[in-house]
Amino acid sequence: MKIASDNREVCVGVKIWLCICCIGILLMVLVGGITRLTHSGLSITEWNPVIGVFPPIGERAWIREKIKYMATPEFKYLNFNITLRGFRKLYLIEYFHRLLGRIVGLTFLIPFLYFTYKKKLHRNLIINFIVICLLILFQGVVGWFMVKSGLIDRPHVSHYKLTAHLLLALLIFYLLWRQFLLSTISKVTYNIKVNGTLIFSVISVLIVTQITFGSLVAGLNAGLLDKTIPFLAGKLMLEDLLFIKPLWYNIFENPVTVQFIHELIATLIFLVVIITLLILRLNLFPAYLLLICLCLQLTLGVLTFIYNVPIVLASLHQVTAFILFAVNTYLLHYMKLSKLQYVK
């Protein structure tokens, strides 16, 4: 089969490189979450892909950067009392996030050029990696437009652009992770007693939808909602969920509705996964791993909300969502490319 043939052509070095790139993106997601939660993302008011590699050096350079920050809505409305020392802390967190993005980009680009030069990649892989390279560059542009949306008249970024930034990271991660799986799981067999690829594809869609609403929750600060809101107390009041007109705006603009949908999808994913695993009775490591990651993610989500979005828990909750998606993708590819074992 063609896939198996391509897999045999992928050398160990390429597999290691793909794995490192995936880990790098997970680290970026973690640091990105910390940057948002510490309100550091708007501290750097310019986008300099080359010069921006170097941080301010000396007192005068730091003062110049702070003067630029003083013109932003965030300073005027929220951080008007910030000291130079406090500004440095915010700046360096955002600086590290941007620097890490450059490092991850180079971690992908340089080995890609090397493996291409050494003819370690077949034509299809080269095309795929060129697309990924362009997406990484585009991610930098999307990130800047997201930051820019918080430098005009509001002291926070657009939750839509924040979501686009996160989903693009998820897409890049998926493409790299999928290629890693195709390169690693090389056995192809169709001796499958029960085909569960459709339901796990649906679970993938649900997880992506959940990540989308999780990002909207973050952008709208819905995680900081009063814990006595009706639906949290076991009651459902439509006036809280549907007070914005037209009604469909509530799905994306109403923090109460967005948080409610986020919790609803989480419950749905949990039930679908549990029921599916019980029905199919999969005796597979990735199936057990999926269940463990799902329970961990639900626990992190509940604790994050209950304790008013602490930085550590919220950051772990965000990156674990990517890991959950990766594990489900792993299981999906395992079912497609490997022989399944079932407990009768």
From Swiss-Prot:
Keyword RNA-binding: no
One GO BP annotation of this record: heme A biosynthetic process
Pathway this chain belongs to: Porphyrin-containing compound metabolism; heme A biosynthesis; heme A from heme O: step 1/1
Catalytic reactions on record: Fe(II)-heme o + 2 A + H2O = Fe(II)-heme a + 2 AH2
Keywords: Cell membrane, Heme biosynthesis, Iron, Membrane, Metal-binding, Oxidoreductase, Transmembrane, Transmembrane helix
Transmembrane segments: 14-34, 95-115, 125-145, 162-182, 198-218, 260-280, 287-307, 311-331
Assembly and binders: Interacts with CtaB.
Annotated function: Catalyzes the conversion of heme O to heme A by two successive hydroxylations of the methyl group at C8. The first hydroxylation forms heme I, the second hydroxylation results in an unstable dihydroxymethyl group, which spontaneously dehydrates, resulting in the formyl group of heme A.
Protein name: Heme A synthase
Organism encoding this protein: Ehrlichia chaffeensis (strain ATCC CRL-10679 / Arkansas)
